[in-house]
Amino acid sequence: SXPLPLIVNTWPFKXATTIGMVVIHLKGYTAAGT
């Protein structure tokens, strides 16, 4: 936990933000894997 998850949970569009963050993380892992 950090302050970032707290801010994300406060945003009305947290869902979309969470999905976006997950996609970014997945892209990061994919780039690191290749």
Curated annotation (Swiss-Prot):
One of its GO terms (biological process) is proteolysis. It is found in: Lysosome. It is an enzyme of class 3 (hydrolase). Its main location: other. Its EC number is 3.5.1.26. The keyword Cell cycle does not apply. Keywords: Autocatalytic cleavage, Hydrolase, Lysosome, Protease. It catalyses: N(4)-(beta-N-acetyl-D-glucosaminyl)-L-asparagine + H2O = N-acetyl-beta-D-glucosaminylamine + L-aspartate + H(+). GO terms for cellular component: lysosome. It comes from the Eukaryota. Cleaved into an alpha and beta chain by autocatalysis; this activates the enzyme. The N-terminal residue of the beta subunit is responsible for the nucleophile hydrolase activity. N-glycosylated. The active site is at 18 (nucleophile). The keyword Protease applies. One of its GO terms (molecular function) is peptidase activity. Belongs to the Ntn-hydrolase family. Cleaves the GlcNAc-Asn bond which joins oligosaccharides to the peptide of asparagine-linked glycoproteins. Heterotetramer of two alpha and two beta chains arranged as a dimer of alpha/beta heterodimers. This is N(4)-(Beta-N-acetylglucosaminyl)-L-asparaginase. It comes from Sus scrofa (Pig).
